[in-house]
Amino acid sequence: MSEDISTKLQECRDAIDAIDHQVVDLLNMRVVSDGGADESAVLAKVAKSNEGPLSDETLQAIYRALMTAGLDPTAKAIEPAIVDALDLEIVNLLNQRVKHAGEIGKIKHANGADYYDPAREAQVMTKVCSLNPGPIKNPTIRSVYREVISGSIALEKKLVITYLGPEATYTHQAAITNFGVSLDYRATKTIHDVFSEVESGAADYGVVPIENSTEGAVFHSMDMLVESDLHICSQVYMPIEHCLISQSPLKEIKKVCSKDQALGQCREWLSANLPNAEVVDHVSTAEAVRIAKETEGVAAVASALSAQRYGVKIQARGVQDRDDNVTRFLIIGKTQAKPLGDGRDKTSLVI
């Protein structure tokens, strides 16, 4: 790499560092200044103020991540014009950041680098969390920057991510947690199909479950790792939080449906809170949510993402019997992950 190119890279990185300092500070100012904000109004406003290159979808995902953490309800009300000014500055800075990231991307890709670089993303997350003075918690900062990075990648290449479907399952949620909302997601029917899509080049990366803290290993994924030449690029640990999803209030629910595994993980809660409800196994959690949407008195046990995707109300969160229910998902692809070198690297052996 020539000296001129190295200088250009460093200039872009320095600019991004300066922007990140400002953005993290502004996000913390924003979160304590507008406790009574209506989410839909805020999302519409930031989209209206967006002049690109970030998509409206990406900016709304960024603000949704911020607001999911909870704006301070005790915050002293300030002039709406001040809040609007904060939002405008945040949006403009994020768009400037993406432009600099795009310049870096062009140089790196011209030299054969991948669009998705988990090691580099980990460094970014560590950096922005180190800049965070609070009150926003670091997980929220990571969620925000997950979407910033996702939007940046999408402007360079709309990566295709395949996952074990159907849509709005926990595997889908794990994929979005890792890659952000701005990429192209495609559900498959089987774990074998996930591997096949990536091997054929129809997808850039795949997401499959590998083990659950209560149910144990997912042997089909392990078998495919033995058979396939694909590599493990990254991993995602997802706490499994089941929600009771229904258009009917809790007292009117007569039937609860979901996959047998999900129902089994919520047996005690259902017995205590809906002792007279009929419990019915179904083919998938996503299908159960669709039924709950269309049928009065029916609830589904599924993820919050399912409720969001299908537009159904969440009547209760965290209905699982154990709070330590975690599933580990693998990100698979054709290229090997670069080691972080910070003691957190993992090597997996399949025998």
Predicted regions and their residues:
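Domain-level signature for soluble enzymes in the chorismate/prephenate branch of the shikimate pathway
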Residues: 1-351
